[in-house]
UniProtKB/Swiss-Prot annotation:
Part of the 50S ribosomal subunit. Contacts the 5S and 23S rRNAs. Belongs to the universal ribosomal protein uL18 family. It comes from Methanococcus vannielii. This is Large ribosomal subunit protein uL18. GO terms for cellular component: cytosolic large ribosomal subunit.
Length: 195
C-alpha cells in the first residue's frame, strides 16, 4: 500500500489506484452535460447503460443486458460482436422510447481498438436512432457485426467434425447451426426494431 510520506508525495484516488476510473476523462464526459453510454464486456455477457450524473452517485436511466436477447429468442453466444450490436440496438430502442436521443460514449479504461465490442454497442445505439458522436472508421465492418466471420470459421472447421462439435457445442445444443448465425441475427434485429 502506498503511504504519503511528505508534501511531495500525493496519493491517487482509491478508484484510480484500483484501476477503475480515469477521473480526467470522466470530468470531460460530465462537462458535456449529456447522458453517458456506458458499455462493459465480460467473457459471456455485454452490459450497456445510459447513465446520468448525480451528486450522490450516477443514475442509470436505461439499461440493456445481453441476457435479455436470450429471452427474445437469441441462440448465439451472449459475449460476441453480434450480441454486442443487438444489445446496443435494444438499449437505443429503449432510450429513444424514453425520449433520450442524445448521449456520449464512456469507454472507461478500455483502449479504443477498431472493431471492439464497445463500438459494436455504439453502432447498435446509433442504428436505433440515437445521436452519439463517433468516427465511422472505429466501428467494425458489417460482416463482423452480423456474425459472417463466425459463419466462415464454422464452414472452415466443419471439415474436422470433432473440432467443429467441440467449438460450437452451445450453438448446436440450442438448435442453431453456426452457419445460420447471420440470418438469425437479422431475424432478431427485425424483432428488436419492431418493439
Amino acid at each position: 500500500m502506498i503511504m504519503a510520506q511528505n508534501a511531495k508525495h500525493r496519493v491517487p484516488f482509491r478508484r484510480r489506484r484500483e484501476g477503475k476510473t480515469d477521473f480526467r476523462q470522466r470530468l470531460g464526459l460530465l462537462l458535456s452535460g449529456k447522458p453517458r453510454l456506458v458499455a462493459r464486456k465480460s467473457l459471456n455477457n455485454i452490459i450497456a447503460q445510459l447513465m446520468a450524473y448525480d451528486e450522490k452517485g450516477d443514475i442509470v436511466l436505461v439499461s440493456a443486458h445481453s441476457r435479455e436477447l436470450v429471452k427474445m429468442g437469441y441462440k448465439g453466444h451472449c459475449g460476441n460482436l453480434p450480441a454486442a450490436y443487438l444489445t446496443g440496438l435494444l438499449l437505443g430502442k429503449k432510450a429513444v422510447e424514453e425520449g433520450l436521443e442524445e448521449a456520449i460514449l464512456d469507454k472507461g479504461l478500455h483502449r479504443a481498438t477498431k472493431g471492439a465490442a464497445i463500438f459494436a454497442v455504439l453502432k447498435g445505439a446509433l442504428d436505433a436512432g440515437m445521436d452519439i458522436p463517433c468516427g465511422e472508421e472505429i466501428i467494425a465492418d458489417e460482416e463482423r457485426l452480423n456474425g459472417t466471420h463466425i459463419k466462415q470459421y464454422a464452414e472452415l472447421l466443419k471439415e474436422d467434425e470433432e473440432a467443429y462439435k467441440k467449438q460450437f457445442s452451445k450453438y448446436l445444443e440450442k438448435g442453431l447451426n453456426p452457419e445460420d448465425l447471420p440470418e438469425h441475427f437479422e431475424e432478431l434485429k427485425g424483432k428488436i426494431l419492431n418493439l
